[in-house]
């Protein structure tokens, strides 16, 4: 369980041990509060965060649906990079 800005997240995928809680908390911005999932990927020593919505969320566009994660990783991330997926826990 990861807690940041009164939001709880669960680590659901951790490819190549990409998750680093300290780096995540340092890079997290309140603009990400609206998303159901946060994906973090590493490139050139930098952590990049991107938000995704659950597929059924009315706010989701095609590009922000979590079901497009594989395409995002393939198209926008460095080949074979470490990455992680956090799911927001709503109460």
Swiss-Prot record:
Sorted UniProt keywords: Disulfide bond, Toxin-antitoxin system
Gene3D superfamilies named in the record:
3.50.4.20
Question: Which InterPro entries does UniProt cross-reference here?
Answer: YutD-like, YutD-like_sf
In terms of Pfam families, this protein maps to:
YutD-like
Q: Any S-S bridges, and between which cysteines?
A: 77-81
Q: Please give the superkingdom of this protein's source.
A: Bacteria
- Describe the subunit structure: Homodimer, probably forms a complex with cognate toxin YutE.
**Which purpose does this protein serve, as stated in its record?**
Probable antitoxin component of a putative type VII toxin-antitoxin (TA) system. Probably neutralizes cognate toxin YutE.
UniProt-recorded name of the protein: Putative antitoxin YutD
Q: Tell me which species this is from.
A: Bacillus subtilis (strain 168)
Q: Which gene encodes it?
A: yutD
């Amino acid at each position: 369980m990861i807690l940041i800005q009164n939001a709880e997240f669960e680590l659901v995928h951790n490819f190549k041990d990409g998750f680093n809680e300290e780096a995540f908390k340092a890079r997290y911005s309140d603009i990400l509060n609206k998303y159901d999932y946060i994906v973090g990927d590493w490139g050139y020593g930098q952590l990049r965060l991107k938000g995704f919505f659950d597929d059924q969320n009315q706010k989701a566009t095609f590009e922000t649906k979590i079901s497009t994660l594989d395409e995002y990783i393939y198209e926008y991330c460095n080949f074979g990079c470490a990455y992680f997926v956090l799911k927001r826990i709503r109460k």
